[in-house]
């Protein structure tokens, strides 16, 4: 009887381990959770949300611009603002009223409008902003909204009981482009440093094309576990976006 009980317990343990492993490896099905004419929000992982707003340009038309919201507990961190204050207000309201979360920080990943165009809305809600010292300097020169808190190469912030990071790997799309990462979902926010599959080189007015591929190679080496890679514009995917970007600028 004792041996039978031990065998039964062992079988239960094996079933539990298998079930837990299966749940952990089950693919997440993305779902759109908010849409207006100015902002679309899609849940792309358990605690990661893609936000898309729009920027009217002379050369590329009305461009969709990506950003990321990561969550743990009742706190979130936002990578890149929506492009305008009104769409930023929509995002802030959605996080507050639908997710029931506090925005701990917003992190523009470089100094262009598609990263910090809606920054003033966050400041009006007393949400602290963080960016590299280079981004702050370039934003001032370009008369853009200016992030409040600076860092040199690496920023690590708590969100709930987890961490989110922003890190400078080198020049590419701009002198100041940083990459966001949220390890609990293995999600990378590459911003405009990373291109969607089949994208053109895009705007190069502030780029360092000679260094671009080498910078992305460093990103790839730093985050071998990344499962979701989000470019600044267009469709997100996996690490194939890194490989595509590396080849595009070689």
Give the positions of each predicted feature.
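Bacterial Sec-dependent N-terminal signal peptides
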Residues: 1-25
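Metallo-beta-lactamase
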Residues: 25-28, 36-38, 43, 75-76, 83-84, 130-172, 176-245, ...
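Conserved beta-strand hairpin/beta-sheet module of binuclear metal-dependent hydrolase folds
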Residues: 42-92, 179-192
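Divalent metal-coordination and catalytic microenvironments
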Residues: 47, 70, 80, 95, ...
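Structural recognition of the beta-strand scaffold that forms the well-ordered cores
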Residues: 50-52, 69, 77-79, 104-108, ...
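Extracytoplasmic/secreted envelope proteins and their assembly/folding machinery
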Residues: 67, 88-92, 116-119, 213-216, ...
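Active-site metal-binding motif and surrounding structural segment of the metallo-beta-lactamase
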Residues: 74-77, 86-130
